[in-house]
């Protein structure tokens, strides 16, 4: 069994009585600095264990730096940081590297250690950088059962120094345990109250007081007419009516396939929530109530709600039968890692809810590949609405809608250059100090429209149509959920998960872009992206982070199906990776674990790592 303990979760005094129940400890990987107590926490104390309390320890990255620093090494900054960089690792083929051949390993560090000749820690492996010279990559303690590597053996791009090095550590740990006659106590189930659940873990279902007596039944009918326009369908269903709610998930270009139009009415249930509240707001038919969360958080409330809305009998070829459509804010994700969002300032400046969703029980699905359109409902006895909607769609004129040009003058206010450059320098200092492996610096650009455009061209819907025309993308969206309206045009889909049984969660991070232009061929785009250490490193960092997040939910059944492949889109070439995870068939999990898998993966993945890579940095920003 594996248990994950945060380095500030226990004091050594509290942990010490429980160490005999464990066979070994792995510490690391960071980010942070080993000479900052808040970064290293309990780890520093583990190196000082008395002989009777000693336990084999394997350090990774920050773990190596802490081990070496504790026993007399010097800590220095690299001349050139190595985040997401692959290096050849030299070793002597002994100890951790017994029966290990050539090693190409991924590094995520800006700090390194310099070992002293008379110290108690000795070098097992090293890299030889052009920029940094010789850098220690693995060490062992001369007398204690402590080993460590500076690189990341778990990275998807580490070759030769991964699983075999871990196996060697386990072999060395067992050998030391046998020689010293260390006794490992049998696990006591009562220890769950101290350490929580072993990895991986899906929480048991919340009480299902709202379980439906019978599942909702999906009724689906196909429209005979082929090739209906997404825009025409939307406008026939009320997209023009700015005062009403409207939702569209739009596959406006290849490789997107299905577009989903939510057919809303005044009785459609709206769900909103703001970070810090202890209630969910529910609105329909012009009335609103606040439902107390009780002991639940918003995530478990949503999972419980959706469990009560299970549907069956739909067309399995369609990705959506009914459910929640809307947005979740960045602040909701940041709140999950206990970072203050400056709540009072945030609410004063921003009236947009952090959770803004609508439950869609009637919908229209358009299939761009086949040209087919489907009308569906999960409301009982709703066949009349389906028939009338099909008749309305059948009678639509061909090509009736176009996006009108905006003739008003546009002024753009960019961020202050001096302030922006100073923020870049702050980011660079954080990177060199070891506070983070990457940072995403954002700044607001304000676009103002002068003049008085006509009401027909100034609506959010017309603006979305212009966006869709100028930048068609496979994962576009128009969400009009007052007080918020979201217009989106993106080639990237963050997360998808298939229906049970055999639910597969898939993430497709895009890091690396080349704009299409005359003379920019696929070969040139591939050279610019795949041939760029910076672009590959950025993609690799996110791939490894996603693998970590998925492993935390589904266990070891995580696979990188595609790594850094150039894909063609309407206006750009993109560097795309694909990571998938699913529950192991033999996992000891609740009977309905797959029902909550999507929610758990989404929760675990927020806030996205590229925007919140380090607690220290976002706490200070």
Residue spans for each PLM region:
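Flexible gly/pro-rich beta->alpha loop and the following alpha-helix that scaffold active-site loops
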Residues: 2-59, 71, 174
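Short beta->alpha connector loops at strand-helix junctions that form conserved
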Residues: 5-6, 78-80, 562-563
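Short, glycine/acidic-enriched loop or turn micro-motifs at the edges of active sites
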Residues: 9, 155, 547
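Short glycine-rich anion-binding loops that position phosphate/pyrophosphate groups of nucleotides
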Residues: 29-34, 63, 154, 330
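Flexible loop residues that form catalytic
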Residues: 30, 144, 154, 444-445
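Pocket-forming structural segment of enzyme catalytic cores
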Residues: 42-60, 65-167, 171
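Acyltransferase
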Residues: 153-202
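Extended alpha-helical targeting/anchoring segments
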Residues: 196-621
């Amino acid at each position: 069994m594996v248990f994950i303990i945060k380095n500030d979760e226990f004091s050594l005094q509290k942990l010490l009585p429980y160490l005999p129940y464990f066979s070994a400890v792995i510490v690391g990987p960071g980010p942070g600095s080993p000479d900052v107590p808040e970064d290293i926490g309990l780890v520093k104390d583990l190196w000082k264990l008395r002989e009777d309390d000693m336990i084999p320890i394997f350090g990774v990255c920050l773990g190596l730096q802490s081990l070496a620093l504790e026993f007399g090494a010097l800590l220095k900054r690299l001349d050139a940081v190595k985040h997401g960089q692959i290096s050849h690792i030299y070793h002597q083929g002994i100890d951790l590297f017994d029966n290990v051949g050539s090693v190409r390993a991924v590094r995520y560090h800006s700090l390194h250690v310099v070992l002293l000749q008379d110290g108690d820690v000795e070098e097992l492996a090293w890299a030889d950088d052009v920029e940094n010279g010789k850098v220690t990559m693995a060490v062992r303690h001369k007398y204690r059962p402590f080993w460590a590597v500076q690189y990341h053996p778990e990275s998807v791009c580490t070759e030769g120094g991964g699983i075999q090095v871990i196996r060697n550590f386990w072999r060395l740990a067992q050998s030391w345990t046998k020689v010293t006659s260390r006794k490992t106590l049998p696990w006591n189930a009562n220890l769950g109250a101290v350490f929580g659940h072993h990895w991986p873990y899906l929480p048991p279902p919340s009480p299902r007081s709202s379980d439906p007596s019978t599942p909702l039944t999906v009724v689906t009918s196909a429209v005979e007419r082929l090739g209906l326009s997404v825009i025409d369908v939307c406008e026939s269903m009320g997209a023009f009516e700015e005062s009403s709610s409207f939702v569209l998930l739009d596959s406006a270009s290849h490789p997107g396939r299905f577009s989903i139009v939510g057919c809303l009415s005044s009785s459609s249930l709206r769900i909103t929530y703001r970070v810090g509240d202890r209630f969910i707001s529910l609105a329909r038919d012009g009335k609103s109530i606040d439902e107390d969360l009780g002991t639940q958080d918003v995530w478990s409330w949503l999972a419980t709600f959706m469990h009560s809305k299970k549907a069956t009998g739909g067309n399995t070829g369609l990705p959506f039968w009914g459910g929640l459509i809307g947005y979740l804010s960045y602040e909701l994700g940041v709140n999950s890692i206990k970072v203050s969002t400056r709540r009072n300032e945030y609410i004063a400046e921003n009236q947009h809810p952090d959770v803004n969703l609508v439950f869609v029980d009637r919908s229209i699905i358009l299939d761009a590949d086949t040209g087919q359109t489907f009308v569906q409902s999960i409301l009982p006895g709703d066949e009349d609405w389906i028939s009338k909607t099909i008749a309305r769609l059948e009678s639509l004129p061909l090509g009736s809608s176009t996006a009108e040009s905006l003739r008003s003058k546009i002024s753009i206010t960019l961020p202050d250059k001096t302030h922006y450059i100073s923020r870049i320098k702050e980011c660079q200092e954080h990177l060199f100090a070891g506070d983070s492996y990457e940072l995403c610096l954002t700044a607001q650009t304000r676009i103002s429209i002068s003049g008085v455009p006509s009401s027909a061209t100034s609506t959010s819907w017309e603006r979305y149509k212009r966006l869709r025309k100028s930048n068609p993308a496979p994962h576009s969206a128009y969400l009009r959920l007052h007080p918020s309206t979201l217009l989106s045009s993106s080639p990237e889909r963050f997360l998808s998960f298939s229906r049970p049984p055999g639910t597969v969660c898939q993430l497709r991070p895009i890091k690396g872009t080349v704009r299409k232009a005359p003379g920019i061929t696929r070969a040139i785009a591939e050279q610019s992206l795949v041939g760029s250490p910076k672009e590959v490193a950025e993609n690799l960092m996110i791939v490894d982070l996603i693998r970590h997040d998925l492993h935390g939910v589904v266990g070891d059944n995580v696979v990188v199906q595609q790594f850094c492949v150039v894909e063609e889109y309407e206006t750009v070439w993109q560097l795309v990776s694909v990571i998938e995870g699913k529950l192991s068939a033999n996992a000891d999990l609740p009977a309905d674990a797959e029902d909550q898998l999507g929610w758990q993966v989404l929760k675990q993945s927020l806030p996205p790592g590229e925007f919140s890579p380090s607690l220290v940095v976002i706490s200070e920003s």
